[in-house]
Amino acid sequence: MVTRSAFQGQEPEKRTRISMRTIRALANQIAEKFDPEEIILFGSHAYGKPDAGSDVDLLVVMETPKGEVKTIMEISDSLPPLPFRVDIIARSRATINRRKNSGDFFLREVTKRGKVLYARGH
């Protein structure tokens, strides 16, 4: 899994909890700039019990003609400095489906249990 952190801020024990409103606003920023098919929140903020040190984990479903790593970097670089860490994964729908069909437990869990924050056309 390739991720990139947009974190610029305090140590985890000094951070405050991140509201869903803040997370949705972040997803909307990404959606406006990159027009993804979907943005899915996963990890402790989606299906766990986040604490003050929890990061925000996002799967951005979109075509990645420049490659997944470059796409992740472009998304991360577009974000303003944040007081929390954001881990972004960018995958095309075809890649997600192919990986799920080949037994990728991680992507199965993310697409099954994650919270869709943005869906194009909805």
What are the language-model segments listed below?
Residues 57-61:
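Short beta-strand->loop micro-motif that forms the acidic, two-metal-ion catalytic signature
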